[in-house]
Amino acid sequence: MALMLDEEMDENVTTIKVIGVGGGGGNAVNRMVSDGLQGVEFIAMNTDQQALAKNHAATKVQLGSKLTKGRGAGADPEIGQRAAEESKDEIANALKGSQMVFITAGMGGGTGTGAAPVVAEVAHDLGILTVGIVTKPFSFEGKRKMGLAEQGIANLLMHVDSLIVIPNERLKMISQEKITLMNAFQAADNVLRQGVESISALINVPAFINLDFADVRSIMKDAGYAHMGVGSAKGAGKAENAAKAAISSPLLETSIAGAHGVIINITSSPDIGLEDVETAAGLITQSAHPDANIIWGTAFDENLSDEMRVTVVATGFDNKAADGLRNSLNNAAGTGASTPSAVFSSDVSGAGAAKQQPAAAANSAAKPVEEESSDNRYYDELLAILNKRK
């Protein structure tokens, strides 16, 4: 009987995979592996063979080996996109068996910007709940890189269920004191790590008031832009402080104001007072839309002592841009027409939707990529820029 129970529990465990695409996404995966994050599987995908070899992920997928010869995308999102399209079968094989995936990438470069939307498309077509968490460049990196990033985000939004965007510019807001470049990027990665860790625990760890994968899916499926925050606090006012930290992170462009779908999870010691739970949940509920679908759960952790931890996932914002992209996608599907992945324009003057250039893509398909990868030189270049400004 016990064996049957164990088998049933194994079947009910939701498989969650975290996919780092390109240099920035690969670095985020490396940090999570080093932090010992449990309950998820890690996959690294890159055009750069050397960077992939150094990655700590258990599963690795080289994108576009025929196209790039393992040299990277040369900071060209179109190359990144074509490389991922070449490797769609390998991507699908790596994703099989998962119910939920997080796709993380740095937007504005080559592989992450171009390949992440293709990876998301494959995942979504497999029926996997697909969540994107990406970063946007610093303002000093220039309009062209920002324009490519905005294009990449628009393309990604078409294929994910939920999308969380972290502007690097906001990394300067995490401390009043001088912050190192390494600490800044770690702070961005922490948003991903805490979110993945919290959602994995929500779904797979038994709790006093339990949430399951169906709850998470009901909030995050086909939701567009999303907010995911984790707050913790101790002592007097911990409920209010933890809730406020969860609903308004300085690193995100979003808050939960106007959200139509909200997941609340409160973790604390078993002796938590009802008043604290009511304070935290009430503050979050008041910040969302009056008719929001609120799903909440609570778990006990003896190790937290006086600490309360609040996790919030919010979706269903009134966003015309997101709705427009999704309507275009749905209209194409409704007419029976296939919706091609957006092709990147090499002439980007600002943010905007991706321009369709099938002819240009076809003409360049036969050309091998000779550029050395700049995805992983990105951080060296960034350090050089910062050093010049000292």
Which sequence ranges carry the predicted segments?
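Tubulin/FtsZ superfamily GTPase core signature
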Residues: 1-390
